Amino acid sequence: ESIKNGSIAYPDNKDVISEEINYYIQNDKLITLKQTIDKEIDGGNADANFYFIRGYINDQIGVGSIDANGKKGVGKVDTAYLRKAKMDYLKTLELNPNSLDATFNLGVLHTTFGNYFYETASKLPYSETVKFDALKKLETENFNKAIEYFEMADGFSSLSNTERIEMYGYMKQLYGKTKQLDKIKEMNAKIDALRMQK
């Protein structure tokens, strides 16, 4: 309650606002947190971190980890929330081009989109050729965009070896899906080199 009073008394104090956000994270109240962040963004009082956190919440709703009410989700993809997450991550990068988290999460998000379009296309009847071709195009575009963001993330020195190996694993799968076999060999070599450093 003192945090809420503080944010009312000192609406321009980002330390108080950050403390309030941390409280909601620790108490698993993501939707309440999202409402708080929406208010700060609407009031013009938000930096890159606010957009990133809102993007993360929308991302979690989009992949079905939680529902729009903050309850445990059933794993159903909601592309509307994924698009909201994408816009927030892009705004994060606009305000802070050095945000590794936003860059990496955009790679994951585009992978999710690509997988969604793949699965949607695979369920179509054979007669739906035009729709199938359109979905396959979206699938490829998103996988290529995911690779682009992961390649950008690879340029950050703050990635640990473990995180980098995990990311190279994602990239290997994407290179396989986009039929870039030479790149798979390159990822295998990078993974082997990093494992030897452990």
Model-derived features with residue positions:
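Residue at a conserved register position within TPR or TPR-like alpha-solenoid repeats
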Residues: Y24, N58, S65, H110, ...
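Short coil/linker segments at helix-helix boundaries
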Residues: Q60-K84, T112-Y149
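Structural register within alpha-helical repeat arrays
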Residues: E20, R54, I61, L106, ...
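Canonical positions in the second alpha-helix
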Residues: G6, K39-E40, K91-T92, A153, ...
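Structural marker of alpha-solenoid helical repeat scaffolds
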Residues: A9, G43, L95, F156-S160, ...
